[in-house]
Amino acid sequence: GTASAMPVVERYQSAHVLEIRERLFLIDCGEGVQRQLLKNRVSLAKLDSIFITHIHGDHLFGLFPLLSTLGLSCRNTPVVIYGPSNLAPFLNFFMSYYGKGIGIEINFHPLSLKEPEVIYETKSIEVLAFPLNHKIETYGYLFREKMPQLNVRKEAVECYNLTLSEIGAIKRGDDILRPAGPDDGASFMNGFVRHSGTDEPLLIRNDEVAYRPYVPRSYAYCSDAAPSPELYTWVKGVDLLYHEATYLDEMADQAAARHHATTLQAARCALEAGAGKLVIGHYSSRC
């Protein structure tokens, strides 16, 4: 949703679903999140982890009904939650009254950070948490795909009759240098040139025979967040930046007093960070 603390008819409160490599990550969990998940046909079975930025109600109060639903759905893996350490009493209260009844296990990872730190990692993904400038302990999250391993073009394997050891070397980023020999005749095949001859070694260039299956992408979630100079560097070069923009620029004094950002400040953060695209939200009901 794009609403902030005060509920409005047209907009739901903060919650984003991010899909990476067939894994779903839920970032914040405001009221109405389950309805939006159902409306957009998001499968809870694919939910990997939940990331809470801070314990203000418009970012949190949809979590406990969602946990109940996950229990009713007979989830057989723990619900993994990351968030500020002061989220723990809320989870403990919920589990002490309802935990046995819903039959789920919660693995909570409390955060207490002064600078960015990797909090989640797989072979293909990493998530960093970093502190945000807000009235209470608040964290932003940066999701990054890792650089994928090089693949070798099928036509190159056929053209050069690559051995398994040569394929392994190419996947590590190496060039292949074959010594001169009687079998290195000059020929063309599928765009590759076999031009060595018997008197010269054959150089197989890595950049001609290898490729990466995809370009790694990144996404940063920054809410709630008043401007801070460190934030620009922490999300430097991100492909997609979500930054709260609670107020219009003419309400900058109110934004500063409440540790929020204006639309112009969100745009400036994206510009300074060199973000590819900017998405804004968390709009005040006054705007």
For the regions a language model picked out, list residue spans one by one.
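An N-terminally biased module of ancient metal coordination in phosphate/nucleic-acid-related enzymes
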Residues: L66, H260, C287
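Metal-dependent phosphodiesterase/nuclease catalytic metal-binding core
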Residues: V17, S112-I280
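Short glycine-rich, flexible loops that bind phosphorylated cofactors or substrates
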Residues: Q34, H59, D249-E250, C287
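Conserved beta-strand hairpin/beta-sheet module of binuclear metal-dependent hydrolase folds
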Residues: G1-V42, N76-P78, Y141-F143, L150, ...
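Active-site neighborhood of phospho(di)ester-bond hydrolases with catalytic His/Asp-centered motifs
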Residues: I27-G30, L47-I55, G83-P84, Y219-A225, ...
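Active-site neighborhood of divalent metal-dependent phosphoester bond hydrolases
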Residues: R75-S112, R286
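Active-site metal-binding motif and surrounding structural segment of the metallo-beta-lactamase
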Residues: E31-Y82, P110-S112
